[in-house]
């Protein structure tokens, strides 16, 4: 079940558990994380960063919709997270795909900007 981060944190608080966040770089990662989450009946965060795309490993427009679709069909609570998005266009693209949470990486930007 696709959820936002507030829903995931609420479950973590109710069950007194930590939630794993896993950076996804291929389809096998998605399967491994979600199959294990279902087996353990644990909520999970699937994350994707810009780095795999910059390194030409995987593109957001290829893997993002698959991540969202698989989260929607699963029995466990899953948040889709854009991890370390370095520009607003890329973050907007992740939200358009269906991601439910983002983290803007501004460490390379000067304080003046």
Locate predicted features.
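Aromatic/hydrophobic pocket-lining residues that form π-stacking "cages" and hydrophobic walls in ligand
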Residues: 8, 33, 67
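N-terminal low-complexity or amphipathic/hydrophobic leaders
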Residues: 26-48, 53-56
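Alpha-helix-loop-beta-strand connector modules within alpha/beta enzyme cores
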Residues: 57-80
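N-terminal amphipathic alpha-helix/helix-capping segment at the start of soluble metabolic enzymes
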Residues: 1-20, 64
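Hydrophobic faces of well-ordered beta-strands that scaffold small-molecule active sites
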Residues: 19-23, 44-48, 78-84, 102-104
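Glycine-enriched alpha-helix->loop->beta-strand junction motifs that scaffold or abut catalytic
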Residues: 40-42, 96-102
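Active-site-adjacent beta->alpha loops and helix N-cap segments on the catalytic face
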Residues: 31, 56-64, 84-93, 106-113
């Amino acid at each position: 079940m696709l959820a936002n981060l507030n829903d995931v944190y609420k479950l973590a608080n109710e069950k007194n558990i930590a939630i794993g966040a896993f950076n996804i770089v291929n389809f096998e990662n998605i399967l491994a994380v979600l199959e294990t989450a279902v087996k353990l009946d644990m909520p999970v965060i699937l994350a994707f960063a810009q780095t795999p795309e910059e390194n030409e490993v995987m593109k957001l427009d290829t893997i993002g919709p698959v991540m969202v679709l698989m989260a929607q069909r699963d029995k466990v609570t899953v948040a889709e997270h854009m991890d370390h998005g370095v520009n607003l266009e890329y973050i907007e693209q992740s939200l358009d795909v269906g991601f439910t949470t983002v983290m803007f990486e501004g460490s390379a930007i000067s304080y003046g900007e």
